[in-house]
């Protein structure tokens, strides 16, 4: 596998949950809802709202405050640490993806994680040791900006030192893809392994 001669691609940004790994947050909060005998659809909706509105995903509040808000808003119950473990257990790295990352880096590309996450990402790395696969880890908990903020994409391009058109952004959420596209990034809306690998072929000669 080699980059096509006229290809300008310099870097690839991968989302974590929903791309590099299974979407553990959504799956986890739905399991928590079932355990608490609460409607999973309601808990999922509220969880995604609160992880942003409390500021937890931007590092502006701690985990205890997030779970307090969740329990008050939805009626879920349980020890905070056990609730967190339910979610973390649902983040499962797709077994084929590390090899793809390695092959892309062998072509001289910068491969980065760009994730709306909390310090849970660090805990997942302690378990699965995946940070070493990437050139950079951009986690909203530390950057203070989420992918809902279009300015984040300017920051990333500046940090990497590449023009937006030299960066491929891969995410499973259409809204994030559209924001990146408007900033000039190349994009791929992740649906499954087959369509992702097929889309990569336009950048490479096999």
Show which residues each predicted segment covers.
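N-terminal helical cap/lid subdomain that shapes the substrate entry/recognition surface
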Residues: 3-98, 106
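Generic structural signal for small/hydrophobic residues in well-ordered secondary structure
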Residues: 15-18, 59, 104, 113, ...
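Short, solvent-exposed loop/turn segments at secondary-structure junctions
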Residues: 19-20, 25-26, 117-120, 143-144, ...
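Glycine-centered short loops/turns at secondary-structure junctions
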Residues: 106-108, 184
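Substrate-recognition "cap/lid" segment bordering the active-site pocket of phosphatases
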Residues: 119-168
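Acidic, divalent-metal-coordinating active-site segment for phosphoryl/phosphodiester hydrolysis
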Residues: 152, 172-185
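C-terminal cap/substrate-recognition subdomain and adjoining C-terminal extension
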Residues: 162, 183-187, 193-206
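Conserved acidic E/D residue at the C-terminus of a beta-strand in Rossmann-like folds
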Residues: 171, 191
């Amino acid at each position: 596998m080699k980059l096509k001669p006229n290809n300008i691609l310099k870097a690839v940004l991968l989302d974590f949950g929903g791309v590099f790994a299974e979407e553990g947050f959504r799956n986890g909060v739905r399991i928590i809802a079932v355990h608490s005998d609460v409607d999973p659809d309601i808990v999922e909706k509220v969880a995604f709202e609160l992880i942003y509105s409390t500021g937890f995903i931007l590092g502006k509040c701690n985990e205890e405050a997030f779970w307090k808000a969740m329990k008050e808003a939805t009626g879920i119950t349980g020890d905070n640490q056990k609730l967190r473990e339910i979610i973390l257990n649902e983040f499962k790295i797709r077994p084929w993806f590390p090899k793809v990352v390695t092959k892309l880096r062998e072509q001289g590309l910068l491969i980065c994680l760009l994730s709306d996450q909390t310090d849970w990402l660090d805990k997942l790395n302690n378990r699965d040791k995946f940070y070493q696969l990437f050139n950079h880890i951009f986690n909203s908990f530390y950057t203070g900006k989420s992918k809902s903020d279009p300015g984040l994409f300017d920051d990333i391009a500046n940090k990497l030192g590449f023009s937006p058109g030299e960066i491929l952004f891969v995410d499973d959420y259409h809204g994030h893809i559209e924001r990146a596209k408007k900033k000039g990034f190349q994009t791929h809306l992740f649906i499954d392994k087959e369509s992702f690998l097929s889309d990569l072929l336009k950048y490479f000669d096999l």
